[in-house]
């Protein structure tokens, strides 16, 4: 499926892992992207408060969630977790969002930025930056109705 380049807007990108969520954001014209410190995931989703603070601080208007599909484009266990978290976040934040196939983004960030054996979350945030750059180039446009499903099981 080919998407059109999305309209410029300030967006938060999330690389969702089981322990941490890598974060990156772009300016309203989608010219520059920056990483933010990765946030730890909590059982009761306390990290949403931190994410909300970043959205308010940088006046972000939507978000994208990386979905790690397998090499055949099929859903993985982690992809299902990411998809569900994206739905939860959209419902909590009331913001439009989209999913982006992030197959191999961690490997790419490790190679591109020379990060090995990272436990700080830096590689997660650089992966979020790669996901964001991919979204800026390829889309898809954010769903204007928060919470609408875009990837089928």
Curated annotation (Swiss-Prot):
Primary residence: cytoplasm
Keywords, alphabetical: Cytoplasm, Hydrolase, Nuclease, Ribosome biogenesis
Disulphide bonds in the chain: none
EC number: 3.1.-.-
One of the GO biological process terms: rRNA 5'-end processing
Superkingdom, taxonomy of origin: Bacteria
Functional description taken from the UniProt entry: Could be a nuclease involved in processing of the 5'-end of pre-16S rRNA.
Protein's recorded name: Putative pre-16S rRNA nuclease
Native source species: Prochlorococcus marinus (strain MIT 9301)
């Amino acid at each position: 499926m080919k998407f059109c380049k999305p309209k410029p807007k300030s967006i938060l990108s999330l690389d969702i892992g089981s322990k941490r969520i890598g974060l990156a954001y772009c300016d309203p014209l989608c010219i520059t992207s920056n990483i933010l410190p990765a946030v730890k995931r909590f059982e009761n989703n306390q990290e949403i408060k931190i994410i909300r603070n970043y959205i308010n601080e940088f006046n972000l208007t939507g978000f994208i969630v990386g979905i790690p599909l397998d090499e055949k484009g099929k859903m993985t266990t982690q992809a299902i977790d990411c998809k569900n978290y994206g739905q939860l976040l959209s419902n909590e934040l009331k913001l439009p969002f989209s999913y982006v196939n992030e197959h191999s983004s961690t490997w790419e960030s490790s190679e591109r930025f020379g990060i090995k054996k990272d436990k700080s979350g830096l590689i997660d945030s650089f992966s979020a930056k790669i996901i964001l750059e991919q979204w800026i180039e390829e889309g898809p446009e954010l769903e204007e109705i928060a919470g609408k499903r875009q990837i089928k099981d």
